[in-house]
């Protein structure tokens, strides 16, 4: 179940304020058990190893959750067209376990000349990211039976997941992409 709750307040002059709180989830995955066999140093002297877990670092799991608060102002014009704008505030939480075996492919490992394993890749608990964006919308009657709607949401610029800076590109950057919707309603 993904929560969604909203409240609106009608104002004078055909305008209104609204608050909407909603969440997104779905990247809750787990890979339990299994083994991974690999050669840790390629043609080097280390032997081939079989280690527990999907990627050789124990059980693997990933979780991403997002929560949004839209603060909206809308106005209905004399011709029946409604326009709206919203500030979108966002929070994300992310956690991953069991991917430490990929440490040799990270930016921080390469920057150390291959001498230090990354500390911002796996098994660091829940990390939080916060950000904001904008949403614009239009709702217009085309006839007595048909209405048209369009919405555009800008990219939501987020703070970085510092605890997982070696996992994501751009040192933990995980912005939420822009969104565009268009539709018709038939009465």
What are these regions (language model features)?
Residues 2-187:
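Outer-membrane beta-barrel porins/channels
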